[in-house]
Amino acid sequence: MQNNEIIKPAKYFSELEKSILLALVEKYKYVLECKKSDARTIALKQRTWQALAHEYNSQPSVSLRDFKQLKKCWENIKARTKKIMAHERREKVKRSVSPLLSTHVLGKEKIASMLPEQLYFLQSPPEEEPEYHPDASAQESFAVSNRELCDDEKEFIHFPVCEGTSQPEPSCSAVRITANKNYRSKTSQEGALKKMHEEEHHQQMSILQLQLIQMNEVHVAKIQQIERECEMAEEEHRIKMEVLNKKKMYWERKLQTFTKEWPVSSFNRPFPNSP
């Protein structure tokens, strides 16, 4: 390779570079994937991408990239992952196998975990209710009479019955299904609330981490400015000392010249006599 040949960065990201990018995006995901679109959040995302690009370029064995290239690569990875997971969702519903299911995507589960709100409907397919077969042999060991089951469940679940109406009493299977649905709904709500609090906490920690990075950069810049001011002051002091030394040497030489031209002994001669 000739010395004057310019080495250009690789056009495509390697698997190693994608892995490093995913690790850094996961580090700042609660800022980069925030759904807010106000000016403060947009500016914060911009600074976060710049900090991420600085960390990325400091890694060994990677090509230098700016934050725009890294952001574009991450958007392409997200779009590809959403497409494949949507296809998997459709295939699960159809109960069929497709060749696309074996498509390899780097860190698909990790990418999905970074997009909880966008891919939630893809990750958690609705639970199917088991069909009720009272005559099935597999359920004989769990079979109980409707009267016994209703007596136990009526202590916890009450259905008001209006007077003057002849509404049939709900069957025990309907009571059990309703109770299970209510329990799952309550559990999912608690899980969603807990997940929301965790995401809010992680987002606050990411913002604090970014603020610390920015404060450190400001302090480093301030120290560098003070060092430059000290160097300038030292240089100015050195120049002033050189000027003063030159003035001192000038007056010393002038004094020596004056002493040679007008020696002190010439002033001690007697005054000449008048004629």
UniProtKB/Swiss-Prot annotation:
Residues 13-78 form the Myb-like domain. Keywords: Coiled coil, Isopeptide bond, Phosphoprotein, Ubl conjugation. Expressed in brain. The modification Phosphoserine is found at S96, S98, S274. InterPro entries: Myb_DNA-bind_5. There is a cross-link at K154 (Glycyl lysine isopeptide (Lys-Gly) (interchain with G-Cter in SUMO2)). Residues 211-247 form a coiled coil. Belongs to the MSANTD3 family. PANTHER family: REGULATORY PROTEIN ZESTE. This is Myb/SANT-like DNA-binding domain-containing protein 3. The lineage of its organism: Eukaryota, Metazoa, Chordata, Craniata, Vertebrata.
